[in-house]
Amino acid sequence: MEIIRGAPALSAFRVQQLMKACDAAAIPVRHIYAEFMHFAHLTNALNDTQTLQLASILTYGPAIEAHTPKGQLYLVTPRPGTISPWSSKATDIAHNCGLSQIKRLERGIAYYVEADTLDASQQKALQALLYDRMVEVIFDDMAAAETLFDRTEPKALASVNVLGEGRRALEVANSRLGLALAEDEIDYLVDNFVRLKRNPNDIELMMFAQANSEHCRHKIFNADWTIDGVVQDKSLFKMIKNTYAVTPDNVLSAYKDNAAVMTGSVAGRFFPDETGVYAYHVEPCHILMKVETHNHPTAISPYAGAATGSGGEIRDEGATGRGSKPKAGLVGFSVSNLNIPGFIQPWEAQYGKPERIVTPLEIMLEGPLGGAAFNNEFGRPALVGYFRTYEQEVSSHNGVEVRGYHKPIMLAGGLGNIREDHVQKGEITVGAKLIVLGGPAMNIGLGGGAASSMASGQSSEDLDFASVQRENPEMERRCQEVIDRCWQLGDDNPIQFIHDVGAGGLSNAFPELVNDADRGGRFNLRNVPSDEPGMSPLEIWCNESQERYVLSVAPENLARFEQICLRERAPFAVVGEATSEQHLTLADSHFNNKPIDLPLEVLLGKAPKMSRDVVSKKALSPALDESQITVDEAVTRILSLPTVADKSFLITIGDRSVTGLVNRDQMVGPWQVPVADCAVTAASFDTYAGEAMSIGERTPLALLDFGASARMAVAESIMNIAGTDIGSFKRIKLSANWMSAAGHPGEDAGLYEAVKAVGEELCPQLEITIPVGKDSMSMKTAWEDNGVHKSVTSPMSLVITAFGVVQDIRNTVTPELRSDKGDTALLLLDLSHGKTRLGGSCLAQVFSSLGDVAPDLDDSTTLKGFFEVMQTLVADQSILAYHDRSDGGLFTTVTEMAFAGNTGAEIDLSALQGSDLARLFNEELGAVIQVSQAQAEAITAQFIAAGVACHAIGGLTEHNKLVVKDGSRVVFQQQRSELRRLWSQTSYKMQALRDNPDCALEEFSLKQSETDPGLTVKLNFDPSQDVAAPYILKGIAPKMAILREQGVNSHVEMAAAFDRAGFESRDVHMSDILSGRISLDEFQGLVACGGFSYGDVLGAGEGWAKSILFNQRARDEFSRFFERDLSFALGVCNGCQMLSNLKEIIPGSEHWPRFVRNRSERFEARVSLVEVQQSPSLFFEGMAGSRMPIAVSHGEGLAEFASMQAMTAAESTGTVALRYVTGTGEIATQYPQNPNGSPNGLSGICSTDGKVTIMMPHPERVFRTVANSWHPDNWGEDSPWMRMFRNARVKLG
């Protein structure tokens, strides 16, 4: 084993954060230093050249000064017997660089802690801060790392002696293994194994428990119900299915696959053909939709729980039909009170929590990062979400009790596209190969399905922790590329049937795969790829290692499938084959036995059906006492409530531009304020048709009225999507995610009431279908605190996601108030007809009350009328701004619109009934629209004719104030900047705890500025002019290599941009270059695309670059290309980082910087303003001096020069091509206008001859005007960024 020191693992402020954590835990530490340590397992010794080569490969990150660390060593490494995702990717890079003697690379972090002697409890507390005990260990000396490469022998099978000891043996196993089997299930298993005349193996019991858990089988939703002694005629699931029975229109697949499918638009799907050439394929672009929850893992380990929640949902989408394409995501969180240190709010009572779960603050600091990181690395934009905090002692249907989200809701969902011929699963033929595609088995995530089906606190802490999975999004990206290549083959798609591997691991996925196709299967356990050779059969078969799919491929198509996988470097293995007999056999060649030998009907067939006999309860809660509440105090508290407040800290961490198909993300207007009501995507690059999605949830209302909460969730999702051009209710489909504390008094009957309200009544009346959903029935946390029994129970929680087919994405209306449209009016659309019910409102919450009566949708025809008029006005472009009334009431609606428009507003309440507080803060269904004064009267008449109350309530003002009047009486007035401070301070506090606090403060200050002009545009050319047109007319399309490496995710939009400019875009994988299948000699141009090559394990883009520099074939290819006279190259984001590390073979690039961690130490997704500099770059010919917004999405974009002299040289040679600037045109030095901290705002640079340009921002994602988060109204189809691609075409003549 060789040991190689690496770069510092923690920046100064990360060390400071760790020191603060030590201080909070009463660990007396004086200083901590941390650095990466690399361990190389060799088959034979390296020579001197190879040693230097390995040292170069492992040199990344900040430069390290030679020194000897001081203090006690805590060496954190992956758990011996495992292979980390870092290891597999770094080892791949080493092999691609020709270092075949390296059997494996592994990495750890050496923490050197200077402290006085720590006692055992302090040592334990310190270690808890330094490592993840599920996947890591701590050593106290370097030599111990040798055990990382020890090989352990497989553990043997265990059986349970049911024949000898009877039922008792199974009861003991149930508890020991955390199976969560019900009494009747234990009886069922005993009866079946007695009938089979053999004892069950532990693997069979775990498999049964996972496959039949509440999580997987949805027993409560399929149960028979008796309520208050009356037998109900329908199950919950039947009531949901009723929506499809009544309105099957536009539903292509429901209730039977990993996601539902609805009819989409006809568009030109853009992808490469079998020769690798990208082209448009005009066909139906159907929409798949799925929303999952990952609540239990997120409560235990927030980052991993949220990351694998997003990853699992993405796999569900990709595994729909015979393979499909995930497109855009959503995320949501409900947690108990944050209790931010130094910022605890008046309504936040300290109730405590059990030790085994983390705090709500930890969930919201770490969980969103996990979800965002997975989406970012996979390459899916996360475009919409919600965040609610709720924890309160209330008087509800059970008297006084604490309700809240100690068990959080972590929502992960999204939409994708699927070909018409692939919507339905195919037939698994007898003898078909049954394949696992993706990462290796690891001993993590055991029993997740059963664990998440229990109320928190019913299982042991070790079992809880064992049930959390770990993530590797770059692996999932590789798998998705394989699926993409398969569905792109159309009729020749080799995939017959596909499922994702989720709860229960292979033990659930393979039986489900064959059972759904009416087949059985013969499997070989030792064919399952594994990174832990010491695992038992149960651990191999039942673990929930992520990033895996199971699928069937006919034997005659196996060679083609293998070829695709090898090109994408996606691991796969044939684990079994399909049989005609519905029997499951798992052979173990190592022990020469059969761990599983069962008829499928025992596993999945006739398990006992659940019956629930429950009693309903009604809430009795006192009304909110308004007598001691002032409007000013209400405003201060409500704008600080996380449910209402600025959610920037949850949004800028997530890529919102990848794919180049995003039309509407969360950020609105020139000031990029996060107030969008919905997300909108384009169906493709050649159309204005698209898709929209929105979220609705009003969960606290359920504490007063279950049915009202459900109706309001559905209605809110409609209100949020109403500003898009959909046309008809029948073009909207809903996902329903139901969360409940089943068994808690009153909750079961309440759940039934809520499902009935939606499934039997409201949705059929609206002609809306719910073709997909999910349930989580254990939303309760119980624990003992010094002998006192405590519990926190969530409200019955329905989260609705609406998905719609958009006719014209250009017509989408946002909440941005327009001050450039002449005389305008603000109209309040009130669907409650004057009611001001405050029960369950944010106003009640921030004054520690629940209230008495909840708002409700009293008449579905009102919502229908509202939607129909809205659709007419949206299509006519008669509405300037739109925002629905929801959390925080009318005051919040208007205030957020003013923030988005950076303007003042004045509203008059005199047309409304009720107290000041009730009028301003009720959360009845409604919306505010801005219309031209000339049209206000006619629009008002349209709404009134449709049964919707409509009131003129005010307009914009010249001053930067929000003024509320009641006739002549001033009810409230305040500077917009002060309201923005109140609204954004929660986000600032969270950002300062999580990220670089200096950056957080700079952004918080900018938000309060009254002089910031926001995003501005200055163009020195005509973007509507197609300068490439004369050359395209020649009929010659120069060949462009769209270069990608494993983990790259921005290649399709790049290909589309060059295709539009007249190039022949060709898909080129690095494996094509390394294998010699493709030569760069064929191409005039090369573009290295953005993403996360190799998961950025050796620094962003550095592993990719080194696999070129240290591989002779690749080095020769690239060197020849760069030295050619008529070649050119572009590197964007990850491609920029990669090319910056190829300086030694790119002429004229010797002064280029490399790109390192952003100053904020966070992934930054922004719309930034850049100015084109005068430079020799062929891409920016004729564009100098132009200032334009552009998408930025990266974690390592800070330009770091080798020296001050190198930076001076780069500036003096005039090769700086782009700079970040402010809205007034100055070089941006402050965050976030300079999103990464690069010196002098540098964001792009070129070679001295202008042939090679590298840039961190993404022009390919915004080459269409509709793909920009904000743009001036007068831009046409092409945004100004299209010019740079056309300039390249012009250069070739």
Curated annotation (Swiss-Prot):
One GO CC term on file: cytoplasm
Cellular compartment(s): Cytoplasm
Gene3D superfamilies: 3.40.50.880, Phosphoribosylformylglycinamidine synthase, linker domain (1.10.8.750), PurM-like C-terminal domain (3.90.650.10), PurM-like, N-terminal domain (3.30.1330.10)
Signal sequence annotation: none
Database matches in Pfam families: AIRS_C, FGAR-AT_linker, FGAR-AT_N, FGAR-AT_PurM_N-like, GATase_5
Keywords: ATP-binding, Cytoplasm, Glutamine amidotransferase, Ligase, Magnesium, Metal-binding, Nucleotide-binding, Purine biosynthesis
Domain Glutamine amidotransferase type-1 residue range list: 1040-1293
Example of a GO biological process term: 'de novo' IMP biosynthetic process
InterPro entries, A to Z: Class_I_gatase-like (IPR029062), FGAR-AT_N (IPR040707), FGAR-AT_PurM_N-like (IPR055181), PurL_large (IPR010073), PurL_linker (IPR041609), PurM-like_C_dom (IPR010918), PurM-like_C_sf (IPR036676), PurM-like_N_sf (IPR036921)
Chain sites annotated for binding Mg(2+): 677, 716, 720, 884
Binding residues for ATP: 305-316, 676, 886
SMART domains on file: GATase_5
Annotated EC: 6.3.5.3
Family according to the record: In the N-terminal section; belongs to the FGAMS family.
Protein's name according to its UniProt entry: Phosphoribosylformylglycinamidine synthase
Protein's organism: Shewanella denitrificans (strain OS217 / ATCC BAA-1090 / DSM 15013)
